């Protein structure tokens, strides 16, 4: 079995790059391949992101064929309510370590997803950096302390 994982990160609302990336993947992608984004898609420097609070950017990435995306610090900048709305756009948004101020997971955001490809299961985990007043760092810090990485 040959599987290609297409991966993007830190696109920072450079949508002209997304169009080129999507065209390349569409031309080369096989059914079993994965397309993952590692976050920082929704940069507030862009009017599309500002006006739609990230939903426009998420729809563009979804249209490009992404299988899942991690929540990056730029998505966290959208704050909880907008982030939950983005997750409601029928896209797998991943973060195993962010919660709201009451330490509850955010609706629509899961820590991981399993993809079955050619009889093999692939676990994809999303981990987000902490940069926002509206999200608590507790789980993030504990996660890395447990790994003796802090």
Regions found by a protein language model. Name each.
Residues 1-150:
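Acidic, metal/ion-coordinating pockets
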């Amino acid at each position: 079995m040959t599987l290609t994982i297409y991966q993007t990160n830190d696109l920072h609302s450079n949508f002209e790059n997304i169009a080129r990336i999507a065209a390349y993947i569409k031309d080369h992608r096989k059914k079993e391949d994965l397309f993952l984004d590692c976050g920082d898609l929704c940069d507030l420097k862009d009017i599309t992101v500002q006006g739609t609070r990230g939903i426009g950017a998420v729809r563009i990435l979804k249209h490009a064929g992404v299988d899942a995306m991690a929540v990056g610090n730029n998505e966290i900048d959208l704050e909880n309510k907008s982030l939950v709305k983005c997750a409601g756009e029928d896209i797998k948004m991943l973060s195993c370590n962010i919660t709201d101020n009451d330490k509850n997971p955010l609706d629509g955001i899961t820590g991981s997803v399993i993809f079955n490809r050619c009889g093999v299961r692939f676990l994809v985990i999303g981990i987000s950096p902490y940069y926002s007043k509206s999200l608590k760092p507790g789980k993030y810090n504990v996660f890395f302390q447990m790994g003796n990485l802090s």
